[in-house]
């Protein structure tokens, strides 16, 4: 683990790590990934949901802190449906769009929106009978195409097919990104959770921020917050990794603090109150 502003002691408690934001909630932001963080990972992504007790804690946190937002690889509108709290912000498609609190139409990065046509055309081209037979699920996220193999009858064969898709995507000049049993094909326009978080905080009057996530895409958010600290635009960043059987080693290395699964995130939300 890294330190918040230097090395973190292994004995550092959750309450101690969060004291910097608990002491000044009106100047603090709480940012959380959704899948694997607020919502447990499930066999089929469409079945994922945020447990009611977690949602209740998140509502209480949103009433206490200056800014609370969910930062997701899903569309912003999909993330809001999952979380079902309209009074917080949502960063969707890995930073490509932002749905402000109470908003109904996400603000999509114009260049990102234009570039999505190539990804949609690629997705339509690679969908074939083999993917259907292997039960690889293709997800259309407008500007991003995702291919999930979690829960396939033969996950090894399904992953091999998805890796062939990745090779084709790279050959066509598209960007590939791997997550927890999912491949994302993205346009060449650079979007990531770090850029999304920076964009979100640009208008926020906060001195400290906590980010909580479980996957490789969340590392971009960690780095984005730390860059803001280095630039003097944010006083403190606390990066919390959510541990699971599939935790990327880089996440454990870069996190200031680790919690165990969505249940650990729930405890963290309680500690913020």
Where are these regions (language model features)?
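Non-catalytic pre-domain segments flanking phosphatase-related domains
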Residues: 1-34, 38-42, 46, 53, ...
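Mg2+-dependent phosphoryl-transfer enzymes with acidic/Ser/Thr/Gly-rich catalytic loops
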Residues: 2-14, 25, 194-273
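A short, Lys/Arg-enriched amphipathic alpha-helix followed by its capping loop at the start of a domain
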Residues: 20-24, 28-30, 57-65, 225
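The start of beta-strands in P-loop NTPase/AAA+ ATPase cores
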Residues: 28-30, 88, 209
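Glycine-rich phosphate-binding "P-loop"
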Residues: 38-48, 180-189
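Active-site phosphate-binding/coordination module
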Residues: 49-141
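Short, structured coil segments at secondary-structure junctions
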Residues: 83-87, 172, 235, 253-255
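Conserved acidic, metal-coordinating active-site core of Asp-based
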Residues: 133-235
């Amino acid at each position: 683990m890294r330190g918040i502003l230097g090395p973190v002691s292994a004995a550092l408690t959750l309450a101690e790590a969060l004291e910097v934001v608990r002491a000044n909630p009106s100047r603090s932001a709480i940012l959380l990934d959704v899948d694997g963080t607020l919502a447990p990972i499930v066999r089929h992504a469409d079945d994922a949901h945020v447990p009611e007790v977690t949602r209740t804690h998140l509502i209480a946190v949103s009433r206490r802190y200056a800014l609370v937002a969910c930062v997701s690889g899903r569309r912003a509108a999909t993330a809001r449906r999952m979380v079902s709290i309209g009074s917080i912000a949502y960063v969707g498609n890995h930073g490509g769009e932002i749905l402000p609190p109470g908003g109904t139409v996400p603000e999509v990065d114009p260049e990102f929106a234009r570039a999505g046509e190539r990804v949609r055309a690629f997705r339509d081209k690679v969908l074939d009978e083999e993917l259907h037979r292997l039960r690889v699920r293709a997800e259309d996220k407008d500007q991003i195409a995702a291919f999930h193999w979690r829960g396939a009858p033969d996950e090894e064969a399904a992953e091999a097919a998805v890796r062939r898709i990745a090779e084709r995507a790279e050959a066509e000049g598209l960007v590939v990104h791997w997550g927890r049993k999912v491949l994302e094909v993205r346009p060449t326009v650079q979007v990531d959770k770090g850029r999304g978080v920076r964009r979100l905080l640009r208008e926020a009057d906060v001195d400290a921020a906590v980010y909580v996530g479980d996957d490789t895409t969340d590392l971009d958010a960690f780095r984005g917050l730390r860059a803001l600290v280095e630039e003097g635009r944010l006083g403190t960043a606390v990066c919390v990794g959510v541990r699971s059987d599939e935790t990327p080693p880089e996440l454990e290395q870069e996190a200031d603090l680790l919690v165990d699964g969505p249940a650990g995130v729930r405890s963290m939300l309680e500690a913020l109150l």
